[in-house]
Amino acid sequence: MKFSAAVFAVLAATGVSAAPAAESVNMMAATPQWTIRDAKRYCRSDDSICNWKFGIDTGNGKPYECRYDVKGPGASKKRSAGPSTCGDFTITSGWSDQFGADNGFTTLSVVSKSKRQIIWPAYTDKQLAGAKIVKPDQSYTPASLPK
């Protein structure tokens, strides 16, 4: 009796572990990288609004110029902002201090509605300080959005 219970337990466990693994799908788009050109953020001295200006170059030879405004108290450190439409693109953003307040950064979400692709360019507070153009330009591989 003890033997048959042990054999049954082993056989039951073996059947569970032999189940096939779920497949995964690579969501990275098989397209050229997108480059954010001449990114610049200017914030008012009272930090009530920050104006972004940048070009989105999807590899077609002509960057699409975008302006994006983040409004409200503490605009430079707003945890969630947007959406804003810029031609075919929808822009949102979020600020994080997960590496400490002195290492804050803003991540943009740039979505192409027609291509159903997204990139997440990120800029540290230090890169954006003084409303200077960020150089070098930064490039990102787009991900495909699920259908």
Regions found by a protein language model. Give the residues of each.
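A generic structural signal for short, solvent-exposed coil/turn residues
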Residues: 10-12, 28, 46, 58, ...
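Short amphipathic alpha-helical surface micro-motifs
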Residues: 17-21, 33-37, 47-49, 88-91, ...
